Amino acid sequence: MDATMMHTPMTVQLILQHGAEVFPDSRVGTFDGESMRYKRYAEIAADAARLAAGLRALGVRPGDRVGTFSWNSTAHLEAYLAIPAMGAIMHTINIRLAAEQIAYVVNHAGDRVVLVDA
């Protein structure tokens, strides 16, 4: 008899891959302050994979901290998926802090890279 236990670990990487394969046309919507913007899950997965590859090219390795300084957006969602999927640690930085506080937080955390909203 099969148990109800899973045979595959539920890592962020496998959840992302599963979503892209099973629900490629499902959409994620974000409000940019003026209108809704939509992106397909397959596109988010592909962009997250590109981001992870870019971070690896910058020298980010499993266990390294990557800061994110961003509003809620699909780009930030892609970072939420890419960073832990590659084994790095995501460190969200409060965008409402003063510049000196941000500098302290980033330096104290030891972020290897900080992703910033443009």
Residue ranges of model-derived segments:
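Structural core segment of the AMP-binding/adenylate-forming
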Residues: 15-17, 57-58, 85-118
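Conserved phosphate-coordination/catalytic loops
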Residues: 10, 42-46, 96, 115-118
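A short N-terminal helical cap/helix-turn-helix that marks the beginning
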Residues: 7-30, 46
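Structured loop/turn residues at beta-strand edges in well-structured enzyme cores
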Residues: 10, 21, 61, 107-109
